[in-house]
Design a protein with these regions (language model features):
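Canonical P-loop GTPase G-domain recognition
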Residues: 153, 162-219
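A broadly tuned preference for mixed-charge, low-complexity surface segments
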Residues: 93-111, 141-144, 184, 207-217
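Short, glycine/charged-enriched secondary-structure capping and boundary segments
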Residues: 58-60, 109-110, 140-143, 170-173, ...
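N-terminal accessory targeting/assembly segments
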Residues: 1-137
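Short beta-alpha junctions and helix-cap segments that line functional grooves
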Residues: 74-77, 143, 198
């Protein structure tokens, strides 16, 4: 983590998903920067009960303190920072949560139903499913429901495309997804030229997460 007196390195921030080549372009973000002129932006990479680990470059992380109000039992969980959130830091203290561009949420257990943010500011979600015994259209649909409505772009990635006896059947089952303009790719992860089909979603300032069962080919 850089010193507070150092200029903000937006190029380094872009490598961890900062969505612009320079200063923030959203008015709501600009307003918070103006309200906290001494603060610096960072991204939450770990979430703990009383604090967070925040980064401002790929290998620069800092343990930080969350605002006192975030630790109150009745404070709404979705108003606390989550992994992927951008925050403003003054020293080791989080002084502002920058408005989320996107959010992936799920229902949280408790006396009253509420939604929990499990990842924020995600541009693309690769929903990974193997074209082998792992292939499960219903699981893909569940992931699409999880992603839907949060602003992130779902991309269905069918791995192990070298197992051609499954590929065409799988694509036929998922024709409906294509009709909904959801990108659908069948790739062979062992072939770099095949995996290169994912590059359009992996540009500077882009944040991608992968979801799928164990053994689906996410690695």
């Amino acid at each position: 983590m850089r010193r507070m007196t150092d200029p903000i390195d937006y190029r380094a921030l872009q490598t961890i998903g900062w969505p612009w080549p320079g200063a923030p372009e959203l008015p709501a973000w600009q307003a918070l920067f103006d309200a906290h002129p001494q603060a610096r932006p960072g991204r939450v990479i770990e979430q703990h009960r009383t604090g967070y680990v925040v980064a401002d470059a790929p290998e620069a992380a800092l343990k930080t303190e969350s605002p006192a109000e975030w630790q109150r039992p009745r404070f709404p969980s979705h108003e606390r920072a989550a992994v992927g959130d951008w925050v403003l830091l003054d020293g080791i203290k989080i002084v502002a949560l920058l408005p989320r561009r996107t959010a992936i949420k799920r229902g949280a257990a408790g006396e009253h139903y509420h939604q929990q943010v499990i990842a924020a500011n995600i541009d693309t979600v690769f929903i990974v499913c193997g074209l082998d015994a792992d292939f499960n259209p219903r699981r893909i649909e569940r992931y699409l429901l999880l992603v839907g409505g949060g602003g992130a772009q779902p991309v269905v990635v069918l791995t192990k495309a070298d197992q051609t006896e499954y590929s065409q059947d799988a694509l036929d089952v998922l024709e409906e997804l294509a009709a909904q303009d959801i990108p659908l790719l069948a790739i062979n992860g062992k072939d770099p030229s095949s995996a290169a089909a994912l590059l359009p979603w992996l540009g500077a300032g882009q944040t991608v997460v992968l979801v799928g069962s164990s053994g689906a080919g996410k690695s």
